[in-house]
A protein has these predicted regions:
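A short, structured surface patch at a secondary-structure boundary
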Residues: 76-138, 142-145, 253
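Bacterial N-terminal signal peptides that target proteins for export
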Residues: 1-10
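N-terminal low-complexity, Pro/Thr/Ser-rich intrinsically disordered segments
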Residues: 33-62, 66-67
Length: 385
């Protein structure tokens, strides 16, 4: 019997009591230490080689001793999504209830949930709750997560296992890259981490190159609405400082609006939307039913909008399901660019580009078709029909 399983047997009784105290309240995810990379000093290497371990510094600034080789992973919070991008899904020894969701917008879940269906449940998902006994029984080498220090300390205390916390990451930002690099180093897939980072950056450079020299006078005013943050919203829920729009240098009506910490959007008054009068509307397809209900109740409001009058209302898949989907966000960014600046993207086959991105991240083909079959793909729509 492995040492971890011996620990599991010894802790089983006390865990029954301690687990009852574990709440499922929403907790902010880990934030990255300023430009901290994983650090393995020569002294640490020399000291740990004999014991088959190594040390890493995580996003919380903690030095964590982990096995020299990691083959069995428990991933929690947003880490399952990040690990899936790194092709680590087959190393999971547990899953989370939320990652088995049937929603089509959880792209990594669509790709891998069949692989995880029979794994023990380690927790609910992204809120910090966990089942320590199930984790110990699964005998992992390491736990990776996106939790804050108090949850990480509790997780380590109840399992006796090394816990590495990475930043949840802001879409297209440096801390997202850092999280991928940290997970790549911990799990022995640094090359794949660099490939993912290079792929994203190549896409962003391509998008910027195509759009950076377009004058503001030639850009339509746009709004991302029916936004997904803390649940779905109707027309009054708008994305703020949306990285998808920034990546194509769009003229975004909602840029600079004040928002709550960790939120990606806000609710605004109908009068504010009329004041903006966006020429193009992008709506999250998963929340389109809310907008259609609002249209049925108040068609006069919608018919005053230039986007509605000119047939410039578009749906795209929700880029958020619990946390941001990197692959959907990238495809949405290309879609926005092609809608807003068709001449700049005249040489891009959208379906081919979308399939390329989805397959790179998910290791599966056919996801674009799945979105279309569910009625939540990419389309120019008419409200009220």
């Amino acid at each position: 019997m492995s040492m971890k399983k011996i620990i599991a047997a010894l802790l089983a009784l006390v865990l029954t009591v301690s687990l009852a105290a574990c709440g499922a309240a929403e907790t902010p995810t880990a934030t990255a230490a300023p430009k901290e990379e994983i650090k393995v000093t020569e002294a640490a290497v020399a000291e740990t080689e004999a014991s088959g371990t190594r040390t890493v510094v995580d996003a919380l600034g903690r030095t964590v001793e982990i096995p020299a080789e990691v083959t069995r992973i428990v991933a929690m919070g947003n880490a399952p999504r990040l690990c899936s991008y790194l092709q680590l899904a087959d190393k999971f020894v547990t899953t989370n209830q939320g990652d088995l969701s049937e929603t089509v917008f959880m792209a990594f879940g669509w790709a891998y949930r069949d692989n995880w269906q029979d794994l023990p449940i380690a927790g609910a998902g992204g809120y910090g709750s966990f089942n320590a006994e199930a984790i110990l029984e699964a005998d992992p080498d390491v736990i990776v997560c996106t939790y804050e220090a108090d949850i990480v300390a509790n997780l380590e205390a109840q399992t006796g296992l090394p816990v590495v916390s990475v930043a949840q990451g802001v879409l297209y930002a440096e801390d997202y890259e850092q999280s991928l690099r940290t997970l790549g180093e911990v799990c022995g897939v640094s090359q794949r981490a660099e490939e993912v980072i290079a792929f994203v950056n190549a896409c962003l450079e391509d998008l910027d190159r195509r759009t950076k020299d377009i004058s503001d006078a030639d850009k339509p005013l746009i709004l991302g609405s029916a936004a997904t943050f803390r649940g779905g919203h109707g027309i009054q829920g708008v994305y703020v400082d949306h990285p998808v729009f920034s990546a194509v240098n769009a003229k975004d009506a909602a840029i600079g609006l004040e928002k709550q910490y960790f939120d990606t959007g806000v609710e605004v008054d109908l009068e504010k939307i009329l004041e903006w009068n966006p020429e193009v509307l992008f709506l999250d397809a998963g929340n389109l039913g809310l907008v259609e209900a609002e249209y049925a109740e108040n068609p006069d409001f919608f018919q005053q909008l230039a986007a509605v009058q000119n047939g410039k209302v578009y749906q795209w898949p929700n880029s958020t399901s619990s946390n941001a989907n990197l692959e959907i966000s990238l495809v949405n960014t290309y879609y926005a660019g092609m809608v807003l600046y068709p001449e700049a993207f005249a040489d891009v086959d959208f379906e081919a580009k979308a399939e390329e991105i989805f397959e790179f991240f998910l290791g599966r083909t056919g996801y674009l078709e799945v979105l279309t079959e569910h009625g939540v793909g990419y389309d120019n729509i008419t409200l009220g029909e």
